């Protein structure tokens, strides 16, 4: 071996010798120093370096203990052979079905259903789930089965009883106005006095007799006077000049009928939508034309709402506004 010059001197070097612990080769002089150090490092385990603890030194951050690794769950044995056999059985069943369809013979029975033995079967619906899904499903399926059984009991109990039907109630009939109430509504309108007015060309006796006959008819037709005797029977006893008891007791109905006749006969409908009635030779506009509550708010033809209250025609179809 050639010598190496070190610090101006020549050092004689022998052959390289391997270390018994780590297997590296050293010169004999260096191997004597390396042997005890290598033996010491081999026996002593080195701690793993944690950089988070080094960064947390000198600060208020508490040192967090490292999380221990969770042990891995044991692996279940694979049932590859069973899966392989089920796969072959399904292929053979499909081939047998195709052959039976071609030949036109009877169809073979379907293969039995396959299931995974690792899955847990639900005792209520007979389905299978893995462990996590089975824990959630079984509780839900239990409550659902209890509800369905309760409904079945209730239906069997009420099976013999007839179903209750809601009885139809007819709408309440509106009370028809009696002659007394009709007189209050019609008395607001300006009407001629029937007592003092005489018809031209007709004797006064005929007018009084016609008014009395109308009053008698109203009195006999009204339900409140059913028990009273007919006034014409009393008229035979009393003289003709005296007024009959029907007019003496209640003279208003005869006058009201005359007023009502004159009002209805003189009712005129104008083409512009206003209604007028001629009383005592004068024209008076009807209440229906003036009050907005009696006019329809929507068109009866197209259903469009009138933009203003005083509109007379529909702005969409042009139909005249209807008076209710």
Swiss-Prot record:
- Sites binding Zn(2+) 1 sit at 19, 22, 34, 38
Q: Which UniProt keywords apply?
A: Metal-binding, Phosphoprotein, Repeat, Zinc, Zinc-finger
Segments of skewed composition (Basic and acidic residues): 48-58
Q: Where is this region: Disordered?
A: 43-83, 150-224, 236-259
List required co-factors: Zn(2+)
Pfam families attached to this UniProt entry:
zf-C2HC_2
Q: Does the keyword Amino-acid biosynthesis apply?
A: no
Residues that the record marks as modified (Phosphoserine) are 222, 291
Q: Where are the zinc fingers (C2HC/C3H-type)?
A: 15-44, 118-147
Which intervals carry biased composition (Low complexity)? 176-187, 196-215
Query: Which residues does the record give as Zn(2+) 2 binding sites?
Result: 122, 125, 137, 141
Q: Which GO terms describe its molecular function?
A: zinc ion binding
- For the modification Phosphothreonine, the affected residues are 243
Highest rank taxon of the organism: Eukaryota
Question: Entry's PANTHER family?
Answer: C2H2 ZINC FINGER CGI-62-RELATED, ZINC FINGER C2HC DOMAIN-CONTAINING PROTEIN 1A
- Record family assignment: Belongs to the ZC2HC1 family.
Q: What is this protein called?
A: Zinc finger C2HC domain-containing protein 1A
């Amino acid at each position: 071996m050639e010598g190496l010059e070190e610090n101006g001197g020549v050092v004689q070097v022998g052959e390289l010798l391997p270390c018994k612990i780590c297997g590296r080769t050293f010169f004999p002089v260096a191997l004597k120093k390396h042997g005890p150090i290598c033996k010491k490092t081999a026996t002593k385990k080195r701690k793993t370096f944690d950089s988070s603890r080094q960064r947390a030194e000198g600060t208020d951050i508490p040192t967090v203990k490292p999380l221990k690794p969770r042990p891995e769950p044991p692996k279940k044995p694979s049932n590859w052979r069973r899966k392989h056999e089920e796969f072959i059985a399904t292929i053979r069943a499909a081939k047998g079905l195709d052959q039976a369809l071609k030949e036109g013979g009877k169809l073979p029975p379907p293969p039995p259903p396959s299931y995974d033995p690792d899955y847990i079967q639900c005792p209520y619906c007979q389905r299978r789930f893995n462990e996590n899904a089975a824990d959630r499903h079984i509780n839900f399926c239990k409550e659902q089965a209890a509800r369905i059984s309760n409904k079945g009991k209730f239906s069997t109990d009420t099976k013999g009883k007839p179903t209750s039907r809601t009885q139809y109630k007819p709408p309440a009939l509106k009370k028809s106005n009696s002659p007394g109430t009709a007189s209050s509504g019609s008395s607001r309108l300006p009407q001629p006095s029937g007592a003092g007015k005489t018809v031209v060309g007709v004797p006064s006796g005929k007018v009084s007799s016609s008014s009395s006959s109308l009053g008698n008819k109203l009195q006999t037709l009204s339900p409140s006077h059913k028990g009273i005797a007919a006034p014409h029977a009393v008229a035979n006893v009393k003289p003709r000049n005296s007024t009959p008891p029907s007019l003496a007791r209640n003279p208003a109905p005869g006058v009201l009928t005359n007023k009502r006749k004159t009002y209805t006969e003189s009712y005129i409908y104008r083409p512009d939508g206003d209604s007028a009635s001629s009383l005592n030779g004068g024209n008076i506009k009807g209440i229906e034309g003036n009050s907005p509550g009696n006019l329809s708010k929507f068109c009866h033809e197209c259903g469009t709402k009138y933009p203003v209250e005083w509109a007379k025609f529909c702005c969409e179809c042009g139909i005249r506004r209807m008076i209710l």
